[in-house]
């Protein structure tokens, strides 16, 4: 089985060449997945680790950033499962609720 780091590199290459994502999207994915890799210390995540990661993100980032970072990691794990690299996606049946504070409209 590949390492988490190798899988991330392959996923980012696939995003760049096959999915033809924009440079800004790729940059965000790279940052998000690098931070995830650092948090996991290169280990494959299970549900418990994902819950700890979510708690870590909630402390360090705004709700909007947390949602984007989780979307990046979730898409990565979905692709791994789709390609048969993982048997089970740890995001399955993991209910994540991140409340964004409601913003009032700005006055003109």
Predicted regions span which residues?
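A detector for short, charged/polar N-terminal pre-domain segments
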Residues: 1-5
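N-terminal core-binding DNA-recognition domain of tyrosine recombinases/integrases
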Residues: 10-24, 30-103
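Basic nucleic-acid-binding interfaces
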Residues: 107
């Amino acid at each position: 089985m590949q390492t988490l780091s190798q899988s991330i590199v392959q996923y980012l290459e696939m995003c760049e060449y096959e999915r033809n994502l924009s440079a800004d999207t790729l940059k965000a994915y790279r940052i998000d997945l690098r931070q995830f890799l650092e948090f996991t210390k290169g280990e494959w995540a299970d549900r418990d680790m994902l819950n700890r990661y979510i708690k870590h993100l909630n402390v360090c980032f705004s709700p909007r950033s947390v949602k984007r970072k989780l979307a990046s990691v979730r898409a990565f794990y979905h692709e791994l499962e789709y390609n048969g690299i993982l048997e089970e996606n740890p995001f399955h049946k993991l209910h994540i609720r991140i409340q964004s504070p409601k913003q009032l409209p700005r006055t003109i």
